[in-house]
UniProtKB/Swiss-Prot annotation:
Role summary: Multifunctional aminotransferase with a broad substrate specificity. Catalyzes the conversion of glyoxylate to glycine using alanine as the amino donor. Catalyzes metabolism of not L- but the D-isomer of D-beta-aminoisobutyric acid to generate 2-methyl-3-oxopropanoate and alanine. Catalyzes the transfer of the amino group from beta-alanine to pyruvate to yield L-alanine and 3-oxopropanoate. Can metabolize NG-monomethyl-L-arginine (NMMA), asymmetric NG,NG-dimethyl-L-arginine (ADMA) and symmetric NG,N'G-dimethyl-L-arginine (SDMA).
UniProt name for this protein: Alanine--glyoxylate aminotransferase 2, mitochondrial
Mutant lacking the gene: phenotype: Knockout mice are hypertensive.
Organism: Mus musculus (Mouse)
Record text on subunit structure and interactions: Homotetramer.
Amino acid sequence: MSLAWRNLQKPFYLETSLRILQMRPSLSLGASRIAVPKLTLHTKHSMPPCDFSPEKYQSLAYSRVLAIHKQHLSPVDTAYFRKPLLLHQGHMEWLFDSEGNRYLDFFSGIVTVSVGHCHPKVSAVAKKQIDRLWHTSSVFFHSPMHEYAEKLSALLPEPLKVIFLVNSGSEANDLAMVMARAHSNHTDIISFRGAYHGCSPYTLGLTNVGIYKMEVPGGIGCQSTMCPDVFRGPWGGIHCRDSPVQTVRDCSCAPDCCQAKERYIEQFKDTLNTSVATSIAGFFAEPIQGVNGVVQYPKEFLKEAFALVRERGGVCIADEVQTGFGRLGSHFWGFQTHDVLPDIVTMAKGIGNGFPMAAVVTTPEIAKSLAKRLLHFSTFGGNPLACAIGSAVLEVIEEENLQRNSQEVGTYMLLKFAKLRDEFDIVGDVRGKGLMVGIEMVQDKISRQPLPKTEVNQIHEDCKDMGLLVGRGGNFSQTFRIVPPMCVTKMEVDFAYEVFRAALIQHMERRAK
């Protein structure tokens, strides 16, 4: 099945009245006209069509949900919005709340819903497997686990062919840390500032986003190094990123020579020479930083960094929790966009389209090193239901050409949103690759100081009120993360763009008062 049937939708234009902004089908195919209204906080958009009607919500009242949450669930405040959404149902790139309101999901459950909410094929496979076998643990064989291992390993280059199935990204990175230390016989592991590799006691040492750090000792043997951020970091230019959109910073580099990369490599060398032992265990890197706000490194940086790590006896770990499974478009795995071959790859989130599963893939040599030192076991890792769902997700990605859709629609989306940088002084940077885009908000383009969190919060609320859900990221929560399910269409991107632009206009109107 391809996505062609989902693209047969009418184009729209914006029709405005004194206070209402609406999208209506245009009279002729391909025609579009946009009237720029004076927007207010009551602006509404008509959404692109959706061929799905949700069931009527008949569960807990909203007030009861709030009471239960306050009394029985974690007091850590992670919910978005002043009045958190009570979601009820999902269909592909759409979400529905308890009141029947429809939202275009451009955050995908934190970059997790890869092929679409409740994808029909994945749901059918889950229902079939749930009536057959839920759980055995890996002390018994079952075909879903072996079928999935064969399918997944076929998508990875040699010698990355040994798979450890686990339950979450934190658990996967936790295991990868143990693997690196067991294989190298060393302790020190390096990760970037701004990196997010999990929230378990072990992986918190690798995670270097301030709000996730604890005021107690932890992270023994973990060392941070400067993130080669070509927008917010000290060096960057106009050719650095593997992206159709570059920074607005000037440089005199030739297209095939990046001075910023060289300077960041010198910083990496300085970390190796001053902050870790002569021999190290490894180096963790996300191909593109997710939680830190879709931060991209200079081209060729990871290739040189991997070589330096291996000179010290360390292994190189690619954290593909957010970048894997075709989301970046040009390649199936993020590490391939850097032309590197890691020793260990971790993956989660999109692997199960929201079902809790994860994996660590490594070489036979590293796997044997772990086996000699640890009887590794995971009760739920390799669960029959998880593996059946994982196989279905891989099949959908291939059958519906979702990697190609990520490339085509993602590039369209990135170039479209990049227009906002030219229009609004508070949009400092638009960056990304495929269906992974970051929009960094600033006070002004000269200082690049982050837009205050209260202002970013209001823009976020306005997007939600107009039917668009986006994520947040960055050390100062200053970057909007645009990461829709991989089945998204250009028409839906157009809607998201108009909503986001309207939210920015509303914000500028508030500022002017």
